[in-house]
Regions:
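Short beta-strand and beta-hairpin "edge-sheet" elements
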Residues: 95-137
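Oligomerization/assembly interface segments of phage tail-like spikes and tubes
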Residues: 50-75, 123-137, 238
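Polar/acidic, low-complexity leader/linker segments enriched in S/T/G and N/D
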Residues: 1-42
Length: 258
């Protein structure tokens, strides 16, 4: 599944926990990343290709084998305290970040569903961990902050290899008074610009373009202060025009299929 034996799970590096990934594959080639699996079914209304319909993505569980290691990558015997410590780290209530040192720019979101202990009589062995991915994608994170006091523009590249529009999260800080009108427009795609106004001086709002929500740092709903024309990013380069006295932090997690 992953080539490197080192990884980060839920913000903690495997070295800190004294564990590593192992594989039992004897071949030179091993599986890498997540499998892509999408079902296609036949519409009963017809028999040619135009009558095939796409089902939802089939998200397959993955298995990772985790061994306890000492200095020099020497496998160690487990004890009950260590088992509890490691399983407590691996079992989470929600999907959490997984980053393999194969490529630290790729983030996966996984949730542990099963742990099986494979030990001999000396408790030497490994944990077989089954995890459910959030999706069939890895994600490339992007975050950049811009400050404008005059109309200006910037370029952002949607690096996803999916043919879908991406809707980012915008953190907007109003640097003017309540009369300041903030406009954000993607000139690369058709559609109206996103407009928000009536914010207090230095008020910060988070705009989730996918969920269609606008909240300030007091968790107050400010949806009524925008026109609900959410920013969308096309694949590849996008030129974004901005007007108003504003600080914008644009945050993306572009999905990629490997």
């Amino acid at each position: 599944m992953f080539v490197s034996d080192k990884f980060i799970f839920n913000g903690i590096h495997s070295d800190e926990m004294g564990v590593a990934l192992i594989t039992f594959d004897s071949n030179v080639l091993n599986k890498y990343g997540l499998n892509f699996n999408r079902g296609i079914s036949l519409d009963k209304g017809g028999g040619d290709m135009s009558h095939f319909v796409q089902d939802g993505d089939n998200i397959e569980e993955i298995e990772l084998n985790i061994v306890l290691i000492g200095s020099g990558f020497t496998p160690m015997a487990w004890d009950d305290e260590t088992i509890m410590h490691i399983t407590s780290w691996l079992i989470t209530d929600s999907f959490v970040e997984f980053i393999s040192e194969d490529n630290i720019d790729l983030t996966y979101y996984l949730k542990t569903t099963k742990i099986v202990k494979h030990f001999n009589h000396n408790k030497e062995g490994y944990l077989q961990v089954t995890l459910q991915p959030f999706s069939n994608c890895a994600y490339i994170k992007y975050s950049k902050k811009y400050t404008f006091d005059n109309p200006n523009s910037f370029t952002i590249k949607n690096v996803s290899n999916l043919n879908e529009m991406y809707k980012p999260i915008l953190q907007i800080k109003n640097l003017g008074d309540a009369s300041n009108i903030i406009t954000i427009e993607n000139t690369t795609v058709e559609g109206e610009p996103f407009v928000i106004e009536g914010l207090d001086l230095n008020e910060v709002v988070q705009v989730d373009s996918l969920l269609g929500t606008v909240y300030n740092d007091k968790n107050e709903n400010l949806l009524m202060k925008c026109n609900r024309k959410w920013l969308k990013l096309a694949k590849n380069e996008n030129v974004i025009n901005v007007s108003g006295n504003v600080e914008i932090d644009i945050k993306c997690q572009f999905p990629v299929i490997l």
